[in-house]
Amino acid sequence: MHSVFSYLNESLILFLVTVMGFAFLVGIFLGKPVIHWLKKQNYYDQVQKEHCAKLETLHKDKKYTPTAGGVLFFLVLLMSIFFLLPLRKPSTWLFVFSIVSWGSLGWYDDIVKKKRKKGHGITAKQKFIVQLLLSAVTVITVFFIDKENSLFCTLQVPFFRTIFLGSSILAKLFCFSLAMLAIIGTSNAVNLTDGLDGLATGITCMSSFGLLIVAIMSPTNPLAYDVSIVLATLVGISLAFLRYNCSPAQVFMGDTGSLLIGGILASCAVMLRAELFLIFLGGVFVAEAGSVILQVASCRLRKKRIFLCSPLHHHYEYKGIPETQVVARFWMAGLLCTVLGIVAALWR
């Protein structure tokens, strides 16, 4: 195992902690004005859920809670990037593209939900097509930032080491596909996890911190420094948003937040060539998305449900476990996943 201290630069750690603090304070300061604006614009959560009468009953008190609070993530992340990253670097504009594009997709979905009586957003097919395009632009940009492709065709393997897959077309195709899968999968997984007060926000904070450790331990990666700043900002704003999102929530992140978080978190992993670490660090996200996939597959193939309701957190709600207990237990699982991911990074 490498000594973690061999990777830690005291000035870098102090700087990243300062970035976290900056993001936290700005998020706390902007939180109430953003919530007030969302209420004024009537961005309220839609509780009408077809075939989920029990969820409507359980969440009936949430209909007066504003959604689309992800604009807070949008604003603070952009502020941090424009203040702290050099504008001449292509990676800076890749971050800007990721935040603006994924945030805009989520924002549009929230707008559509607001206008429709039953709270339906854009169709899954429409969303997937846009996600496919956005992830492709991100991966292609990373490919061309790395002119020699020595970075793009490497892969950080948990508990093992960083491996070079070669410069063949097959290796590039594999890396391209893995990166696309990571971005699309993570954006949807975070979106599915965002269903209870504070759940997705808390898990985001933990997984972002874990990936930040991976970034710090990737000194040979030319993009690691910039990625670490973005991740430190994401940790800080997540903590600030949790102030307003924990039970009883004053605001929900909505698709504006969940799609943005998933998109930028996975984009950071792609730039670090650490997509496989998302399986550990985002273990709760994986479980939530996996429960939906299994439920749909079982209903179509066996005509039976595996879970009382999916995603997984709703299954436990259906069993009568209070929302705060479900969130607390998922947070504990998320913490264990984060610790496991950090150990996987150190044990190499």
Swiss-Prot record:
It is found in: Cell inner membrane. The keyword Lipid biosynthesis does not apply. It is a multi-pass membrane protein. One of its GO terms (biological process) is cell wall organization. Signal peptide: none annotated. GO terms for molecular function: metal ion binding; phospho-N-acetylmuramoyl-pentapeptide-transferase activity; UDP-N-acetylmuramoyl-L-alanyl-D-glutamyl-meso-2,6-diaminopimelyl-D-alanyl-D-alanine:undecaprenyl-phosphate transferase activity. Keywords: Cell cycle, Cell division, Cell inner membrane, Cell membrane, Cell shape, Cell wall biogenesis/degradation, Magnesium, Membrane, Metal-binding, Peptidoglycan synthesis, Transferase, Transmembrane, Transmembrane helix. The keyword Cell inner membrane applies. Its EC number is 2.7.8.13. It catalyses: UDP-N-acetyl-alpha-D-muramoyl-L-alanyl-gamma-D-glutamyl-meso-2,6-diaminopimeloyl-D-alanyl-D-alanine + di-trans,octa-cis-undecaprenyl phosphate = di-trans,octa-cis-undecaprenyl diphospho-N-acetyl-alpha-D-muramoyl-L-alanyl-D-glutamyl-meso-2,6-diaminopimeloyl-D-alanyl-D-alanine + UMP. It comes from the Bacteria. The chain crosses the membrane at residues 11-31, 67-87, 92-112, 128-148, 163-183, 198-218, 222-242, 251-271, 276-296, 326-346. Pfam families: Glycos_transf_4. It is an enzyme of class 2 (transferase). Its cofactor is Mg(2+). One of its GO terms (cellular component) is plasma membrane. Belongs to the glycosyltransferase 4 family. MraY subfamily. Catalyzes the initial step of the lipid cycle reactions in the biosynthesis of the cell wall peptidoglycan: transfers peptidoglycan precursor phospho-MurNAc-pentapeptide from UDP-MurNAc-pentapeptide onto the lipid carrier undecaprenyl phosphate, yielding undecaprenyl-pyrophosphoryl-MurNAc-pentapeptide, known as lipid I. This is Phospho-N-acetylmuramoyl-pentapeptide-transferase. The lineage of its organism: Bacteria, Pseudomonadati, Chlamydiota, Chlamydiia, Chlamydiales.
